[in-house]
Curated annotation (Swiss-Prot):
Family as reported in the entry's similarity comment: In the N-terminal section; belongs to the succinate/malate CoA ligase beta subunit family. In the C-terminal section; belongs to the succinate/malate CoA ligase alpha subunit family.
Needed cofactors: Mg(2+)
GO molecular function, one term: metal ion binding
Residues the record lists as Phosphoserine modifications: S263, S450, S454, S458, S480, S662, S838, S1099
Protein name: ATP-citrate synthase
Length: 1100
């Protein structure tokens, strides 16, 4: 959500810190918080003024009218405060319909004052700007401030000065206090704007001869502005409304939501409830809650929540397991119900999200059966058949009753089934989302008709008018429709061209496929803009043909080279969507902008709206999937994949236009309208934010003026008053076409505490903003309003059939659309094709949520403390080695890490480093010296000693044989060390191996060889390379993890040399860093260390 309430303490703390005013604000930071865990001695240490002043105490839990409820203790001593708190702190209280525990109180100094010194100030945000309210009589009996207070609208981007405040607000204020009040209100407004508040009320504001006192404060901030205000806000807390506890599970989901590009929401309403929901989509989640409450389940509804925006399988698993954990804590005598519902997704891979839910169900299958949980599933969208299949399979394998339904079932029908004694039979669905591969004109579930013109070209004035309006609406509650001067009634046509901001290749390909199936002459996407790469071209498909679409770094270049473009689809993130949209509106050719991002601060959205109105630009969004005009154009992912485009007949125009807030619900409307009428003419999802760029009425008026539109469908929502404009339009005769409308969110009036639904704007701030009030007003105005969302399809069909009967709509002949090839990647995901891979790997898999080494998740690697040796065992040998083997590998890496700067590898590395080369170049220079003469002895010694040992010849015979053949025994001999001056590296390794290895036959053989060679020359010892070689073979052969064939294969393919390469790389890097640290210059070898031996005839 966007606007969130903060505690009084938080509001005052921010105000005292950041308000800038000449008025003397008293009692700054003088407040003390008391909870059941408060240590009074510690509190007095921090706030010594508690002992010396009269005090006021009150709960700080978002409770309104505390004074009227007797929840304010006034003019008390500290002992009086303690006595006053005793029957209240930690005890239950009832406020309206809400019951909750009082556990957070605020103590402040008592301010003696008269009634004449109390004032009321409030600032709140609207679409047009911010209203400032002032009343000269504040306090507990202030009454209806909307009618009594002086009110001033400060427009978007306008400033509030002291003179305006005095002239418009302080009309009735005492003369001697006007200067102080004007300065304070001016500073308060600037503070409100700077810290992105959406609501700020002070009542009473007390002004005495000493200065200004802020007694009671209530506030909301725009939570989406966190990335802007983080420095000033700090870690701000958003307490739950009174009557609802804050649960750690809610905080956990909020944390997941904050770390994800998807949307994850959870509110616990009644943890003991019988009915639990796990719904996809901000709009759909509200509709399911409405339906449950309509059927009498309000007291059994346990939670509200939603997941949307294509969460990954892991994110959905985390979300699902949280809900399953909560619902299996307490048993219910009638068992429990889990509704896994959702509308038809636009771009979320249903199978991927369902696999996450299925994992959670498997993990909790025992608890689910113990608590007698029955699960009802309904979903549609990309790959939904596979999702439904895996959901049905888990029901069969676990024994949990899971009833699965697809798009052929009405979205909320499963709620009724949960109460019904019998479950209807589920008709078989296709095995995959690939219906568009074949001409499906014979199928009832996926019709394949097509056309490029409207069914009827009859005039708008021939359409049956809406029902006569009843004069019941108060004038001030129904603002007149906003002027559309300068804005086109037609946003899209068959020739519309768009620029897409953002590297959204999947969305662009979806638009091109839609264009192709609509038989457009050219693709609708002319270019893309992506500031993070240089100019280039991106490959896409136009039917079977490959095409190139240019990608520009700068928007100016894209606009200049494509003057025919008049639509921009903005996929920028919430942080850059504002700036990129503002830049777009500098180009006069752009008439429509769709903003997809969710989470743009409301204050910035209002600035976008103001500039768009000035420029005559229509904005769709923010927080939207976009819109669609069948047969012409679609925005981004709107309408989902091609199978849904065909099933909902979106490739050709119908006669019904709709507008909704929700993207998912707009796709559900596509489905409903296609099954009950001749199809969609145009549909727009204006977005779930509080201030959408264009409103319901903007689009309803467009549809009214469009001859091809014969009836209008509006899916309204709780929050805001835009739907009342439709009532006004009918009353004034501006709207004559039939309008079907239903406002979702009717359940909100049944809850005892306020619930913020999935959309930022879905929250009623007054009675007129509730869905129930709006539905009633619409009905009285003559709009066709169903009794519930369940009946929406029936009333749409009834109105449509009436228009057909009157001849206003003449159904046209259907024509099959062209077939479109399926993308290779999607076909592979659906399991329709297979292809031999070019590469194979068996040691690492990075594709899932967690990196996996040879089958072991990285979390397990750290949990088991496997170390570098253990990781090498997994990556080199595909298995988990014994602990001593891992330790031995690590010891080998340590002893081979370096051997001084004089050896060839280190020498090369140093020379490269001093020549100014980078780390990788210097390192590879050193590594390239490793071979038979340097570093290669590990492999050679292992092979040579193994061959001799396995052939059965005794050590003396082996030494004699090598001498006879004139070959050196690899791994024997050292330039400095000898039998009398042993190499401590070898000694350390030998002690470890003898202590931990189960058997060391090859090492024993090599030590016998050493006895023979050192008897002739004391430095012919088994050196560190030879020791590691033979000991490694012993480890491979005797640790129990390998067969003899596997052990020999690893020696043959050079695994042992890898130990030296990896170990010595550490030393080479050390030498590189050392030279850079010492700032050594270019190395040139001295002449006197070089013998110039030239041919004799040349030197003469």
């Amino acid at each position: 959500m966007s606007a969130k309430a903060i505690s009084e303490q938080t509001g005052k703390e921010l105000l005292y810190k950041y308000i800038c005013t000449t008025s003397a604000i008293q009692n700054r930071f003088k407040y003390a918080r008391v909870t059941p865990d408060t240590d009074w001695a510690h509190l007095l240490q921090d706030h010594p003024w508690l002992l010396s002043q009269s005090l006021v105490v009150k709960p700080d839990q978002l409770i309104k009218r505390r004074g009227k409820l007797g929840l304010v203790g006034v003019n008390l001593s500290l002992d009086g405060v303690k006595s006053w708190l005793k029957p209240r702190l930690g005890h239950e209280a009832t406020v309206g319909k809400a019951k909750g525990f009082l556990k957070n109180f605020l103590i402040e100094p008592f301010v003696p004052h008269s009634q004449a010194e109390e004032f009321y100030v409030c600032i709140y945000a609207t679409r047009e700007g911010d209203y400032v309210l002032f009343h000269h009589e504040g306090g507990v009996d202030v009454g209806d401030v909307d009618t009594k207070a002086q009110k001033l609208l400060v427009g978007v981007d306008e400033k509030l000065n002291a003179e305006d405040i005095k002239r418009h607000l302080l009309v009735h204020a005492p003369e001697d206090k006007k200067e102080i009040l004007a300065s304070f209100i001016s500073g308060l407004f600037n503070f409100y704007e700077d810290l992105y508040f959406t609501y700020l009320e002070i009542n009473p504001l007390v002004v005495t001869k000493d200065g200004v006192y802020i007694l009671d404060l209530a506030a909301k901030v725009d939570a989406t502005a966190d990335y802007i205000c983080k420095v000033k806000w700090g870690d701000i807390e958003f307490p739950p409304p009174f009557g609802r506890e804050a649960y750690p599970e809610e905080a956990y989901i909020a944390d997941l939501d904050a770390k994800s590009g998807a949307s994850l929401k959870l509110t616990l309403l009644n943890p003991k409830g019988r009915i639990w929901t796990m719904v996809a989509g901000g709009g759909a989640s509200v509709v399911y809650s409405d339906t449950i409450c309509d059927l009498g389940g309000v007291n059994e509804l346990a939670n509200y929540g939603e997941y949307s925006g294509a969460p990954s399988e892991q994110q959905t698993y985390d979300y699902a397991k949280t809900i399953l954990s909560l619902m299996t804590r307490e048993k219910h005598p009638d068992g429990k119900i889990l509704i896994i519902g959702g509308s038809i997704a636009n771009f979320t891979n249903v199978a991927a999200t369902f696999k996450g839910i299925v994992r959670a169900i498997r993990d909790y299958q025992g608890s689910l059966k113990e608590h007698e949980v029955t699960i009802f599933v309904r979903r549609g969208g990309p790959n939904y058949q596979e999702g439904l299949r895996v959901m049905g399979e888990v029901g069969k394998t676990t024994g949990i009753p899971i009833h699965v339904f697809g798009t052929e079932t009405h979205m909320t029908a499963i709620v009724g089934m949960a109460w019904a004694p019998a479950i209807p039979n589920q008709p078989p669905t296709a095995a995959h989302t690939a219906n568009f591969l074949l001409n499906a004109s014979g199928s009832t579930s996926t019709p394949a008709p097509s056309r490029t013109a409207s069914f009827s070209e009859s005039r708008a004035d021939e359409v049956a008018p809406a029902k006569k309006a009843k004069p019941a609406m108060p004038q001030d509650s129904v603002p007149s429709p906003r002027s559309l001067q300068g804005k086109s009634a037609t946003l899209f046509s068959r020739h519309t061209k768009a620029i897409v901001w953002g590297m959204q290749t999947r969305a662009v390909q979806g638009m091109l496929d839609f264009d192709y199936v609509c038989s457009r002459d050219e693709p609708s996407v002319a270019a893309m803009v992506y500031p993070f790469t240089g100019d280039h071209k991106q490959k896409f498909y136009w039917g079977h043909k490959e095409i190139l679409i240019p990608v520009f770094k700068n928007m100016a270049d894209a606009m200049k080279k494509h003057p025919e473009v008049d639509v921009l689809i903005n996929f920028a993130s919430l942080r850059s969507a504002y700036d990129s949209t503002m830049e777009t509106m500098n180009y006069a050719q752009i008439r429509t902008i769709a903003i997809i991002a969710e989470g743009i601060p409301e204050a910035l959205t209002r600035k976008l709206i103001k500039k768009a109105d000035q420029k005559g630009v229509t904005i769709i969004g923010p927080a939207t999937v976009g819109g669609i005009k069948p047969g012409c154009f679609k925005i981004g992912n709107t309408g989902g994949m091609l199978d849904n485009i065909l099933a909902s007949k979106l490739y050709r125009p119908g006669s019904v236009a709709y507008v909704s807030r929700s993207g998912g619900m707009s796709n559900e409307l596509n489905n409903i309208i296609s099954r009950t009428t001749d199809g969609v003419y145009e549909g727009v999802a204006i977005g779930g934010d509080r201030y959408p760029g264009s409103t319901f009425m903007d689009h309803v008026l467009r549809y009214q003026d469009t001859p091809g539109v014969k009836m209008i469908v509006v899916l309204g929502e709780i929050g805001g008053t835009e739907e009342y404009k439709i009532c006004r339009g009918i009353k004034e005769g501006r709207l004559t076409k039939p309008v079907v409308c239903w406002c979702i969110g009717t359940c909100a009036t049944m809850f005892s505490s306020e619930v913020q639904f999935g959309h930022a704007g879905a929250c009623a701030n007054q009675a007129s903003e509730t869905a129930v009030a709006k539905n009633q007003a619409l009905k009285e105005a003559g709009v066709f309003v169903p009794r519930s969302f369940d009946e929406l399809g029936e009333i749409i069909q009834s109105v449509y059939e009436d228009l057909v009967a009157k001849g206003a709509i003449v159904p046209a002949q259907e024509v099959p659309p062209p077939t479109v090839p399926m993308d290779y990647s999607w076909a592979r995901e659906l399991g329709l094709i297979r292809k031999p891979a070019s590469f194979m790997t068996s040691i690492c898999d990075e594709r899932g949520q967690e990196l996996i080494y040879a089958g072991m998740p990285i979390t397990e690697v750290f949990k088991e403390e496997m170390g570098i040796g253990g990781v090498l065992g997994l990556l080199w040998f595909q298995r988990r080695l014994p602990k001593y083997s891992c330790q031995f590998i690590e010891m080998c890496l340590m002893v081979t890490a370096d051997h001084g700067p004089a050896v060839s590898g280190a020498h090369n590395t140093i020379i490269c480093a001093r020549a100014g080369k980078d780390l990788v170049s210097s390192l590879t220079s050193g590594l390239l010296t490793i071979g038979d003469r340097f570093g290669g002895a590990l492999d050679a010694a292992a092979k040579m000693f193994s061959k001799a040992f396995d052939s059965g010849i005794i050590p003396m015979e082996f030494v004699n044989k090598m001498k006879k053949e004139g070959k050196l025994i690899m791994g024997i001999g050292h330039r400095v060390k000898s039998i009398n001056n042993p190499d401590m590296r070898v000694q350390i390794l030998k002690d470890f191996v003898k202590q931990h290895f189960p058997a060391t036959p090859l090492l024993d053989y090599a030590l016998e060889v050493e006895k023979i060679t050192t008897s002739k020359k004391p430095n012919l010892i088994l050196n560190v390379d030879g020791f590691i070689g033979v000991a490694f073979v012993d480890m491979l052969r005797n640790c129990g993890s390998f067969t003899r064939e596997e052990a020999d294969e690893y020696v043959d393919i050079g695994a042992l040399n890898g130990v030296f390469v990896l170990g010595r790389s550490m030393g080479f890097i050390g030498h590189y860093l050392d030279q850079k640290r010492l700032k050594q210059g270019l190395y040139r070898h001295p002449w006197d260390d070089i013998s110039y031996v030239l041919p004799e005839h040349m030197s003469m």
